[in-house]
């Protein structure tokens, strides 16, 4: 995947495709309209988050595998992506990443919620760009730090220190610009005039994933996400009930997306917020039980959960869908708090938690380098979790950190 994205990284500016040097693609299509150029999506770059996410993935792969050879191979592409963030992504020099389409044919909104009406103010008026999405700033923070870790692993100390300084500068500015005490969470976005879109959204949950939010803010964001207006019983809605454009049957303004919830779960785990994490997992697990073949769909409607009834299907949701499928592993990883230390040949389970209805988890062939391990984890009274190694192949250590 990293090589695939790197091979398609933009090398020149092309307004028709929203392409700029170093930018990572948003999507590629092979239909007739794309092939004839009627729509710009043959190879389209109108996504403000794909580029920092690419850097995050490259850093995560290095930390997971210790593969410095691949990191060295990808480094020119990581450098180009970071350069795009600085030169093109930050449109006005304020340190935040913003977007705005360059032609009328491009996407009006270029975050993961790319519906035309997905970014708005509390009164329902659409935000005018360039728009700085809240979650994208968190991704940028993680990308600067991830790039720094790659640079340091490759012996580029001066570069690493410069990237760390950029991450710290963004962290200092972020909270002041985005925090909205009146709604108990971060703003959905800043518009082109730097006015906050004071809307309760799932986007704010992604902020927990990268460490840009202080601990006290993370706890407050989690509480807001798990309020009935946001948490429908099956998962966190994209937009909270009561917001101006809330519609539980809409694509991005009140529905529930498993991948969205998976990222929130990882953030909750990072901050040690175990109770909301277990509650979130319970909703998604129950939703899967009601779905055909026990799969999580791309999304479902955000109507409140009722006794004896499953979630309301979104009629044209993909099933299966890659994002949704990955969310199951994200949530499991969040529960178990699994991290990898290739340099120490160690797998760690940090503050693992299992919900009351899940007594045991068995994992086979969990790999680290050329070694692997089979293990089982049990839940005990008092929410304690124990671990037992069943089989070990090669040199590998397993540790539980509570």
Model-derived features with residue positions:
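Substrate-binding cleft of carbohydrate-active enzyme catalytic domains
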Residues: 1-7, 11, 36-92, 126-145, ...
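Extended, well-ordered alpha-helical scaffold segments
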Residues: 1-8, 68-86, 139, 143-147, ...
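Beta-rich accessory regions
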Residues: 150-177, 181, 268-279, 344, ...
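Active-site-proximal binding-pocket segments
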Residues: 255-261, 272-281, 288-296
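Active-site-proximal structural scaffolding
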Residues: 47-50, 71, 78, 133, ...
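Catalytic cores of secreted or luminal carbohydrate-active enzymes
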Residues: 314-362
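Well-ordered alpha-helical scaffold segments within catalytic/enzyme domains
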Residues: 53-70, 84, 136-157, 206-217, ...
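Extended glycan-interaction surfaces of carbohydrate-active proteins
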Residues: 3-45, 91-132, 172-256, 289-313, ...
């Amino acid at each position: 995947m990293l090589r695939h994205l790197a091979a398609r990284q933009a090398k020149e500016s092309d307004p028709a495709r929203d392409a700029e040097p170093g930018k990572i693609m948003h999507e590629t299509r092979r239909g007739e309209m794309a092939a004839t150029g009627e729509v710009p999506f043959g190879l389209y770059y109108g996504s403000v988050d794909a580029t920092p996410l690419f850097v995050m993935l490259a850093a995560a792969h290095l930390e997971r595998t210790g593969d410095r050879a691949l990191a060295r191979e990808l480094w020119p592409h990581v450098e180009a992506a970071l350069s795009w963030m600085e030169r093109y992504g930050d449109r006005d020099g304020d340190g935040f990443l913003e977007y705005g389409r360059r032609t009328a044919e491009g996407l009006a909104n270029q975050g993961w919620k790319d519906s035309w009406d997905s970014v708005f103010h509390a009164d329902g008026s659409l935000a005018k760009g360039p728009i700085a999405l809240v979650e994208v700033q968190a991704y940028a923070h993680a990308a600067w730090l991830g790039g720094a870790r790659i640079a340091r692993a490759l012996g580029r100390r001066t570069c690493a220190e410069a990237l760390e300084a950029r991450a710290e500068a963004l962290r200092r500015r972020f909270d002041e610009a985005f925090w909205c005490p009146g709604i108990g969470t971060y703003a959905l976005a800043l518009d082109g005039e730097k006015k906050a879109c004071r809307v309760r959204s799932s986007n704010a949950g992604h902020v927990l994933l990268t460490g840009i939010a202080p601990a006290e803010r993370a706890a407050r964001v989690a509480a807001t996400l798990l309020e009935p207006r946001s948490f429908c019983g099956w998962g966190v809605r994209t937009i909270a009930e009561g917001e101006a454009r809330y519609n539980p049957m809409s694509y991005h303004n009140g529905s529930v997306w498993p991948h969205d919830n998976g990222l929130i779960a990882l953030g909750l785990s990072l901050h040690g917020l175990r109770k909301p994490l277990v509650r979130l997992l319970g909703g998604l697990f129950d939703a899967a039980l009601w779905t055909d073949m026990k799969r999580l769909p791309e999304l479902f409607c955000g109507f409140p959960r009722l006794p004896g009834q499953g979630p309301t299907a979104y009629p044209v949701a993909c099933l299966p869908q890659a994002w949704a499928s990955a969310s199951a592993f994200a949530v499991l990883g969040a529960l178990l708090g699994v991290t990898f230390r290739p340099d120490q040949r160690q797998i760690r389970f940090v503050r693992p938690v299992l919900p009351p209805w899940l007594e045991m988890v068995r994992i086979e062939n969990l790999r680290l380098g050329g070694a692997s391990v089979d293990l089982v984890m049990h839940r005990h009274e008092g929410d304690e979790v124990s671990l037992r190694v069943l089989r070990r192949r090669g040199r590998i250590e397993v540790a539980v950190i509570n």
